[in-house]
Swiss-Prot record:
Keywords: Acetylation, Lipid droplet, Membrane, Transmembrane, Transmembrane helix
Residues that span the membrane, as ranges: 31-51, 65-85, 86-106
Residue list for modification N-acetylalanine: A2
Protein name as catalogued: Oleosin 16.4 kDa
Region (Polar): 2-33
Highest taxon in the source lineage: Eukaryota
UniProt membrane topology term: Multi-pass membrane protein
Coiled coil: none
Gene Ontology cellular component list: membrane; monolayer-surrounded lipid storage body
Family according to the record: Belongs to the oleosin family.
Length: 154
């Protein structure tokens, strides 16, 4: 049995039939892709290394200053944080108060029925405006017509 050479079919041969797909190497597109991206990737990696180095050096130089000035910096940071939180919360409370007053005012208007009067007044105003625009349109049309007749006479 050991003297007999068995031929095993590969996965590609099973899937594609008995056709074998011989490739001698990477395609031209793959080679160009690698040649294009290798310098770009190397440059970006070098820039990342320089950035990391600069950050570590800056941190090493600034750490003693942070330790020395921490009795001043920490309370100052806390004070700034509390001031910003105070301004933001006062703004939120103001908006909440305005929306509450608006809600109460609208509920009061609905209860007294004054909103129907406001709606009727708005309808009359719109009707008056439509009538005014219609009248102005007629006047403008007559003016243009008169000018056209005058231009035709001369």
């Amino acid at each position: 049995m050991a003297d007999r050479d068995r031929s095993y079919r590969t996965f590609d041969q099973v899937v594609r039939g008995d056709r074998t797909n011989y490739q001698s190497g990477p395609s031209t597109t793959q080679v160009l892709t690698v040649l294009t991206l290798l310098p770009i990737g190397g440059t970006l990696l070098a820039l990342a290394g320089l950035t990391l180095t600069g950050t570590v050096i800056g941190l090493c130089m600034a750490t003693p200053l942070f330790v020395i000035f921490s009795p001043v910096l920490v309370p100052a940071a806390i004070a700034v944080f509390m001031a910003v939180a105070g301004f933001l919360s006062s703004g939120a409370f103001g908006l909440t108060g305005l929306s509450s007053l608006s809600y109460v005012f609208n509920r009061f208007r609905q209860a007294t029925g004054t909103e129907q009067l406001d709606a009727d007044r708005a309808k009359r105003g719109m009707q008056d405006m439509v009538g005014y625009v219609g009248q102005k349109t007629k006047e403008t049309g007559q003016t243009i017509e008169n000018k056209a007749h005058e231009g035709g006479r001369t």
